[in-house]
Amino acid sequence: MIYPVIWQNNCVLLIDQTRLPNEYAVVEIHRSEEMARAIQTMIVRGAPAIGVAAAYGMYLGAREIETSERQEFLQKLEKVAQLLRATRPTAVNLFWAISRMLKTAYETLGTVAQIKENLLQTAQAINAEDLQTCQVIGDNGLAILPKTPTKLTLLTHCNAGALATAGYGTALGVVRSAWREGRLERLFADETRPRLQGAKLTTWECVQEGIPVTLITDNMAAHCMKQGLIDAVVVGADRIAANGDAANKIGTYSLAIVAKAHNVPFFVAAPVSTIDFELTDGSQIPIEERNPVEIYQVGDTTLTPPGVEFYNPAFDVTPAELITAIITENGAFAPCDLTKSSKQAVV
């Protein structure tokens, strides 16, 4: 199993996902500022993994605070939370994990040392819970995949695998469960421009576990569906509104439109912590814009002439009506049933 975030020897170990697939490297994180930078630069990425990393980042920040006075400690911890919140605006798991850590701090009665101890325990609990959640999501997804053919060919976008979570994955968790039960023929992976998470990360995960994988460019999906090569689409999500609108990596929306046009089921797999019940619909989801260098430069090569302007949103929002079902640890639900079926599980 692949574990992108590990607590070991009083520090956090992160798989450096910016170096995959050509180099497997592990980065040690000792301070909250280092964690914020790792999240911002996508050394660690994927909404659930970011949440786990942020939880540990909160503990690292708490560990750095040198005071025994409770109120002063909590004020400084709020500044750590502010630092981490500013890293990635779209992934709601980040904010959820930070809020849970703050709740632990404020509700702990006792010394500052006891608060710090409880914060570490909470971060470790978030880590363990996410791993278990992903395994359940995988099995819940397997249960609602099309029954025919016996062996399915699935298509995914970006990387919603073990690297994007505490382990196992959400969308790739469904793929893993299907592979384990003999129900997967092959996975098609979109390359996912501009950062190529599908090409670099999803294919890498599949190769590690012997899962048959075929890489395609993003603009090949419609052709593959027309040729009858795809039985279902399974993607992850970074934030889901109460009505079922789902924000995921840029290109997911167009993939959902194409799937609808070809009568291919389109599933979103995500933990309940990704659902933001405070947002009525997807128009309220903040969309991160990243450095345009991701578009116009590959390595040291610039692809465009001078004078070109760029627009680089990292995410788009897929309307609920294009989604067949949202797969959570509580089961799989039609988007219209999301609130009544899942809200009680939100911490």
UniProtKB/Swiss-Prot annotation:
Report the top EC class in one word: isomerase
Instruction: State one Pfam family annotation.
Output: IF-2B
| InterPro entries xrefs | IF-2B-related (IPR000649), IF-M1Pi (IPR005251), IF_2B-like_C (IPR042529), Initiation_fac_2B_a/b/d (IPR011559), M1Pi_N (IPR027363), NagB/RpiA_transferase-like (IPR037171)
| UniProt pathway annotation | Amino-acid biosynthesis; L-methionine biosynthesis via salvage pathway; L-methionine from S-methyl-5-thio-alpha-D-ribose 1-phosphate: step 1/6
What stretches pass through the bilayer? none
Show the catalytic activity. 5-(methylsulfanyl)-alpha-D-ribose 1-phosphate = 5-(methylsulfanyl)-D-ribulose 1-phosphate
The record's EC number reads 5.3.1.23
Q: Where does substrate bind?
A: R45, G46, A47, R88, Q197, N248, K249
Q: Does the keyword Transcription regulation apply?
A: no
Q: Where is this site: Transition state stabilizer?
A: C158
Q: Where is the active site?
A: D238 (proton donor)
Q: What is one Gene Ontology biological process annotated in the Swiss-Prot or TrEMBL record?
A: L-methionine salvage from methylthioadenosine
Kindly state which keywords UniProt assigns to this record, in alphabetical order.
Amino-acid biosynthesis, Isomerase, Methionine biosynthesis
Superkingdom of the source species: Bacteria
**GO molecular function, a single term:** S-methyl-5-thioribose-1-phosphate isomerase activity
Q: Which PANTHER family match?
A: METHYLTHIORIBOSE-1-PHOSPHATE ISOMERASE
Family matches, as HAMAP family: Salvage_MtnA (MF_01678)
Give the family, as the similarity comment puts it: Belongs to the eIF-2B alpha/beta/delta subunits family. MtnA subfamily.
Q: Which NCBIfam families match?
A: eIF-2B_rel, PRK05720.1, salvage_mtnA
Its function, per the record, reads: Catalyzes the interconversion of methylthioribose-1-phosphate (MTR-1-P) into methylthioribulose-1-phosphate (MTRu-1-P).
* Name of the protein: Methylthioribose-1-phosphate isomerase
